[in-house]
Amino acid sequence: MNIYFAGPMFAKADLLYNEYLVKKIRDLDDSINVYLPQENGAINDKRAYADSKMIALADTERVLESNLLVAVLDGITIDAGVASEIGVAYAKNIPMIGLYTDTRQQGADNQKKLAALGDTAENQFHYLNLYTVGLVKLNGSVVSDEQAFLDLIKETLNK
């Protein structure tokens, strides 16, 4: 199974988290082939040169070759590249699993947090772009923890 891993990849923390998750995915089964864009030095060695068309063509080709796209949705906003990859996968009906671990999504039953929504600039919850999330959900699902993420990947593998 070919899996495309979409995630932010410009901060050291992002790179390390991506490596951590991809190792866990690869350890699920020997038949899994994960494409992690940050491992593609031809376009993602930031000391070298790759123009926008080179990057778009290389990553789009790998999205289109995938049987599953998995995406890290965490961040101030969903990473622009991740959103683009999700759009390509949606258009080609490629199944998707989104991972959204932001702790601000917790407390949906806390009445004080809910009441604060009526006070300007007091949103206690994190916002994700609903269009992008909708594309993921139309072709799959979004989960909030790593184990559920890995379980869904394994479930998809066994279909």
Regions found by a protein language model. Name each.
Residues 1-159:
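Conserved catalytic or regulatory cores that recognize and/or transform ribose-phosphate-containing ligands
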